């Protein structure tokens, strides 16, 4: 399998120096600080998550760099915690409406499990609604229970990750597209909206 470098290269400061979210997180010569949700972990009681949105509003006022959320489709108590419980994209859209400056980041979006069209539609929508503040931390996934649940072979996650990143990058391009990928194909169609600044920073995280 050959994947074009231009479609899979990650974020770098020169490429995203004018991106509102990325430039807040990776400011040259500055140490930046953000928060990683949740601050209190779910253990059967949703009330532990109360008040987090108000906290995010406050860190936005206090000039923090970023708020991070996680992509945890299934809670497996034998493996680890449930993250912030809420769907990461729905929750970031909610937080985008309550903030003005803080970068909105995922750590990590599981590209090997989610279809790139759905990923792009959600990501580009949040980027537009937030004024270009979205940064995607991306990963291939590590929770064994999730792969058979999605009908994906865990041993193939690296290849699916690369395929999804390539597909996702192509969807940022303007105009009608012709895409032929192992994950799907279409002719003369376009995914809308597009990211505010033409692309979304992708950062491999774990």
Which residues does each PLM region occupy?
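Active-site beta-loop-alpha junctions enriched in small/polar residues
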Residues: 38-42, 72, 109-111, 139-143
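A short, mixed-charge helix-start or loop-turn motif at secondary-structure junctions
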Residues: 37-38, 77-78, 105-108, 150-151
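Alpha-helix-loop-beta-strand connector modules within alpha/beta enzyme cores
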Residues: 82-105, 160-167, 171
